[in-house]
Amino acid sequence: MAAENSSFVTQFILAGLTDQPGVQIPLFFLFLGFYVVTVVGNLGLITLIRLNSHLHTPMYFFLYNLSFIDFCYSSVITPKMLMSFVLKKNSISYAGCMTQLFFFLFFVVSESFILSAMAYDRYVAICNPLLYMVTMSPQVCFLLLLGVYGMGFAGAMAHTACMMGVTFCANNLVNHYMCDILPLLECACTSTYVNELVVFVVVGIDIGVPTVTIFISYALILSSIFHIDSTEGRSKAFSTCSSHIIAVSLFFGSGAFMYLKPFSLLAMNQGKVSSLFYTTVVPMLNPLIYSLRNKDVKVALKKILNKNAFS
């Protein structure tokens, strides 16, 4: 067996989002549309930032990486989910399942920390504007990004290593559209106490630390904004931060609802719907939120469109 050292199961069957035949094809086209918008939006924003020298600032450096992360983890999940709508039996090998789990967790944890890095960047820009380029130097930005991906790797390794130590017997039906922690633990035939403990500790850190960082950053930002005399300056500061607050609320709200509930009380079907927000909706909305509410991005896009129109 391919995985006999840790499991009696060599493949899993993904139950998918729903088992109702009448909605499978409509859902396929709906989520295919979501995925196309996600890919076009995030790759478009990445291209726009690379092509426009005015966007080569710390703020857009982090936004560039946010779009990269959104594109990657959406691509880890969505293609397999789409297959569940058109195949009678959507199977995935044990190795494929563990690989999907690792990369999904890597990108999701990285997203939580890139959002906190973006909040810190906005704090420095608004509260210490004169020292902004010194504080957020290329070296500092690189170290922050290294920390973001380092935490992503650590979180993914912790969960995946623990999952590979779990024994799976006859039950290989995963009540989900992807290989995620809690649905996989439902298939285990041995104690999952250690895994559940790791979920609460590691997920608590991966959600708690960024959330605290973001709350502190925005508390200081709001305090600073209220001391701005001009209405125009105050409005500009609020506009700069509002898009980030919306993205943060969607991502952390749905993630906390999925993972920080007692395992025994978790309704998995409810969890599947909740997980759609951070696996499908958030990656699709992020480029729209940051583009439609960002004057610099809209100006840069108009310049490129005008340049192409007259070339």
Curated annotation (Swiss-Prot):
GO terms for cellular component: membrane; plasma membrane. Glycans are attached at residue 5. It is a multi-pass membrane protein. GO terms for biological process: G protein-coupled receptor signaling pathway; sensory perception of smell. GO terms for molecular function: G protein-coupled receptor activity; odorant binding; olfactory receptor activity. It holds the Pfam family 7tm_4. Residues 47-54, 121-139, 218-237, 293-311 are cytoplasmic. Odorant receptor (Potential). May be involved in taste perception. Expressed in the tongue and testis. It is found in: Cell membrane. Belongs to the G-protein coupled receptor 1 family. The keyword Phosphoprotein does not apply. Signal peptide: none annotated. Its main location: membrane. The keyword Transmembrane helix applies. CDD domains: 7tmA_OR8B-like (cd15405). The chain crosses the membrane at residues 26-46, 55-75, 100-120, 140-160, 198-217, 238-258, 272-292. The lineage of its organism: Eukaryota, Metazoa, Chordata, Craniata, Vertebrata. InterPro entries: GPCR_Rhodpsn (IPR000276), GPCR_Rhodpsn_7TM (IPR017452), Olfact_rcpt (IPR000725). This is Olfactory receptor 8B8. Disulfide bonds join 97-189. Residues 1-25, 76-99, 161-197, 259-271 are extracellular. Keywords: Cell membrane, Disulfide bond, G-protein coupled receptor, Glycoprotein, Membrane, Olfaction, Receptor, Sensory transduction, Transducer, Transmembrane, Transmembrane helix.
